[in-house]
Design a protein with these regions (language model features):
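Glycine-rich phosphate-binding loops of nucleotide-dependent enzymes
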Residues: 1-150
Length: 150
């Protein structure tokens, strides 16, 4: 039998849900360094802060895995540094991070293991140090001595 809830009880339930959601949201905003903006609309934030807000939203669902697709795209150096600290802190919470990124400085500094694709085909896998020395990666992304100069 399902209990019947009157309008007043439903309001109380909704109020408690909202308090819990606000507590979770503020916790995640603090985690990414945006707690001072908790009353602001997301669209009014600077670009790098908007990206961190997106990460905070994802973290509010208590994920086991978070996929970050080009999170540093369009960020300046300071915003990228802030992002690297957040990614490292996410990993320290025991959350797996799948990072899809073209900012090689970020990738080489933050990742433990790399998988490199060229046109959807796996060409290398390993630590950043191993991948940097891989001939297939050098050929695909840095060019070879045999390539013509444009």
């Amino acid at each position: 039998m399902i209990p019947v809830v009157d309008a007043h009880q439903q309001e109380s339930i909704e109020a408690v849900k909202n308090l819990i959601l606000n507590e979770v949201n503020v916790k995640e905003l603090k985690f990414v360094g945006l707690e001072k903006f908790w009353r602001e609309e997301g669209g009014s934030l600077a670009y790098g802060s908007q990206r961190l807000l997106e990460i905070a939203r994802a973290l509010a669902s208590d994920p086991k895995l978070i996929i970050l697709d080009e999170p540093a795209g369009g960020m300046n150096d300071q915003e990228t540094e802030d992002l690297m600290r957040v990614i490292d802190a996410i990993r320290n919470r025991g959350i797996t991070v799948l990072l899809i990124e073209h900012d090689m400085r970020l990738v080489m500094q933050i990742c433990e293991k790399l998988v490199v694709l060229e046109h959807g085909t796996l060409i290398a896998e390993g630590t950043p140090a191993e991948v940097q020395k891989d001939p297939a990666v050098i050929e695909a992304y840095l060019g070879s001595d045999d390539d013509e100069e444009y």
